[in-house]
Amino acid sequence: MTTHQPNRRQFLSAATAGAAMITAAPMAFTASRTSEEVITGEGDYKYRVIHDWPMLPDKYTWQTTHNVAVDKAGNLYVIHEGRKEQADHPSIFVFDPERKFVRAFGSQFQGGGHGIEVREEGGEEFLYVAAYQHVKCFEKMTLTGETVWHKRAPMESGVYSPGEDTNKTATWTPKGFLPTNFAFLEDGGFLLADGYGSCHIHRYDKDANWVSSFGGVGEGKGTFKTAHGLWVDKRPGREPSIVVTDRAHGTLQTFTMDGKYQETLPGYGLPANIDTYQNLMLVPELKARVTLLNEKNEVVARLGAAVERVNEIKGLRTQPDQWLPGQFVHPHDACFAANGDIYVAEWVGTGRISRLERVS
């Protein structure tokens, strides 16, 4: 039987009943206000929330912000989906640590901008960018936007329909290629999640040659419903492992470094991606919260949680006047800054980037 991959709106709808069960438990308190500050979190993990942190020039507009990454200088890189019809509008924006706009580029990803990561190679930093919808590609770029290489569907994997590497239409099926995010390997290679297409995790070598794949569409335990985000977990005291967000199943799955299934961690509201800092793992959940786990994968804080509110107010993502300070709507990605602060990108119509500054 052919299994068809649901699109994002379908899984948000399908997940509503399950997500209603994921409420603001004791660990997920509502943000509190201290004088003019908005604080979220608890115990040793409290953060000052600054919504709409970057200062975007008036000539540009956010068009559904998707992912964020930080370079060694502390600059923030933001990718948004962009509108296909605005082909000259950039999809990637760069801001300095003081919130100021630095540059913009990446119009080639308009209408499909999705994943972005920064990686240092031989003393130089590069961007890795994944695009879905009709764009259907991934690229390595310099920090100023020059293309190093450009890739499309790995046909040698045997996963895709004939011609998928030249197909310019979005194919939301297990035979289609709609890449979402990256993770980096110690040998210079990388992993690419085909989260909205085949749900395979593809391994590439340091020269961007396809090596192998694992995963695919299925019901879990090594297969996925939406293999949306991933990370190589190298936190102290743990054996290195690959962690994949199986978003539509509401779980994280862990794998050995050669792609063998280990375990499933349940209890997430559409987990979208992963980052780590010291002993912490960060999991942005599309269902209105950001979760922090310790080195034992125990939940230590849930930040900006507004699960019940998002469940109750239909179409909240398009109603900015209804958003509450310190609460998230749809966190789609998050990453740590060098000092442990957190940037959050939300899948909302107007786009929104928040900075969480740690206060305890």
Predicted regions and their residues:
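Beta-strand-rich domains and repeat architectures in extracellular enzymes and scaffolds
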Residues: 51-85
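Blade-loop segments of beta-propeller domains
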Residues: 88-121
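Surface-exposed loop and turn segments in beta-propeller and other repeat-based domains
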Residues: 54-59, 105-109, 149-173, 211-222, ...
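Blade-level signature of beta-propeller repeat domains, shared across WD40, Kelch, NHL, RCC1
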Residues: 330-360
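Beta-rich, blade/repeat-based domains predominating
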Residues: 59-73, 109-123, 159-189, 219-240, ...
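Blade/loop signatures of beta-propeller domains
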Residues: 31-50
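N-terminal secretory signal peptides and thylakoid transit peptides that target proteins
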Residues: 2-19
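A short loop-to-beta-strand structural motif that recurs across blades of beta-propeller domains
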Residues: 89-93, 137-139, 200-202, 251-253, ...
